[in-house]
Amino acid sequence: MANSVYVKFEVPKEIADKVYEALEIARDTGKIGKGTNEVTKNIERNNVALAVIAEDIEPAEIVAHLPILAEEKEIPYVYLPTKEELGEAAGLNVGTASACIIDAGEGQELVDEIVEKVAELKN
């Protein structure tokens, strides 16, 4: 659903799968933020290794500020197709519009790889 106003680039399935894995590892061995309010606060504090935004959010205004804020703070961000899958990877029983990896824990190498590949996508 890359036609959303706030989606600035498409994320290949290979990278999306790695993002799900990194979120799950960080959830279990590090620290993550769940929900747009937590993500926004952590980005503003420069406390995010990777921000993750769902592509299927209606209305788009709920998350439209996140890519702009992340770029302003030079924080890497990525999109995932659905809020349900993002919520599941974040350990929630419901969908979430966004999440962030604060401390990657044992998934630091994976997060570094994702950040590198996302930087290539944006160029």
UniProtKB/Swiss-Prot annotation:
Pfam families: Ribosomal_L7Ae
InterPro entries cross-referenced by the UniProt entry: eL8/uL1-like, Ribosomal_eL30-like_sf, Ribosomal_eL8/eL30/eS12/Gad45, Ribosomal_eL8/Nhp2, Ribosomal_eL8_arc
Top-level taxonomic group: Archaea
GO terms classed as biological process: translation; tRNA 5'-leader removal
Entry annotated with the keyword tRNA processing: yes
Ribonucleoprotein among keywords: yes
Family matches, as HAMAP family: Ribosomal_eL8
Purpose: Multifunctional RNA-binding protein that recognizes the K-turn motif in ribosomal RNA, the RNA component of RNase P, box H/ACA, box C/D and box C'/D' sRNAs.
Protein's name in the database: Large ribosomal subunit protein eL8
Species assigned in the record: Methanosphaera stadtmanae (strain ATCC 43021 / DSM 3091 / JCM 11832 / MCB-3)
